[in-house]
Amino acid sequence: MEAIRILLVDDHALVREALAVQLSSMVEFDVVGMAEDAGDGLAAAVDLTPDVVVMDIDMPGMICFDAAERIKSRLEEVKIIFLSSALHDHYIESALKIGASGYLHKGEPTESLAMAIREVAAGGVYFSDEIRGRIVEKDGSYSLAEGAKMRSQTLTDREIEVLRYPARGLTKKEIAGLMHLSPKTIESHCARVMDKLDIHDRVELARYAIREGLTEA
């Protein structure tokens, strides 16, 4: 039986390397590559054609869901597993829409990730317990349950990304630098987020991000 070929995508070198060591110690896995952001992950996936891509959600540069969608469009058989500390409904919905096969909380042990990789490589799906109760399956496809859809609001992936930073005490200029965007663009994103959520100041915006777990992504 051939080993399952894995590509790891995470902007934290320690996380990437630790996962690579732990997974490589299991005879059924072969970590064929690592990437530090979604854009590099996309290029590596096309070049290496892994069986499974394990991708962090919170990374600078290209939005992970955009990269994953492009990977799926080019490599239909590749399975995507997302890792994140944030279990915000919008993230879950975005992952399901692009056809992710798994979504795990980063706090879970490596063995849970190993189980997820085995399951998705065999054609199944794997979701953390906290997520299973918020999704429904119909004819082999998964989506957010209606109650969760109501909570996910209408925020875009970029707006969700912007929303994480005010609670960390960062200025718009600092956020712009991290996201490689102009301060004016960040200001526009913040204004749209506040309008959609009916929030009227940055303090309230930060509280919302903390309550939704977005600062832990």
List each language-model region with its residue ranges:
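Active-site residues of response regulator receiver
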Residues: 56, 84
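Short hydrophobic/Thr-rich beta-strand motif most characteristic of the beta2 strand and flanking loop
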Residues: 28-36, 44, 199
